[in-house]
Amino acid sequence: TALLGPEPLDLTEIEGADVLYHAEGIIRESEANAAALFGTKKTVYSAEGSSLCIRAMLYLALLHARANHKKPVIAAGRNAHKVFMTAAALLDLDIRWIYGTESVISCAITPAQLEDVIVSENPAAVYITSPDYLGNIADIKSLSTVCKKHDVLLLVDNAHGAYLHFLPEPMHPMQLGADICCDSAHKTLPVLTGGAYLHIAHGTPDMFAQRAESAMALFASTSPSYLILQSLDAMNPLLATSFPAQLKACAERLDTLKAMLRAHGYAL
């Protein structure tokens, strides 16, 4: 007797159902579809949220640092999620905090400020949270330019911005120069809780795409939820068809609402 209802869909890694972090069949095909939609070199699914993706991002940054004889130092905005700190502790990474020019919560980091930090600290990577917890979006394009100038990786916690790629203007970290980012699909897309993406950008060293799955597997459960994976897969045709238009219409309604609020004296 089904207790919740979806039990018939609650598969596990059996023959024909593929293996999430050694994907060769249906999961690999679905992830390739997602990569095409997000314009990435590689996209890997997570059934354990962006928390898992953040650990994998830092592990890949550590491998890159070792390969390039750099110290295991990450420069990070001080508003980073707690999983960033626990992952850094687990991997024995040193953190150099970057404090925002306005507040710790918004942690607005300027390109000039980032340049100073990179020159003084020589980090292996820079870690930015954007959008932040108030909805503010960092100037990823300008920060990326600074990172590329100094050959430093740019990692972005885009947990609250999976939808950004599907707006009319380029706003997603993968469109603006980030090297690796994570999206919590379950936060801003109709995906079950825990569904997330690890994205690897075009132009990054091949090692990142080659090691992405093993980096995820290092921290992940060997029993991923196939219900979550199916919801990620079901999202692909929606992203490819009606979602961008729906998102555009929603953004237009929000613009109208903001104009009304400003007209009534509210500061936004």
Regions found by a protein language model. Give the residues of each.
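N-terminal glycine-rich, Lys/His-bearing helix-loop that initiates the first secondary-structure elements
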Residues: 1-6
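Conserved PLP-enzyme active-site core in the AAT-like
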Residues: 37, 43, 48-267
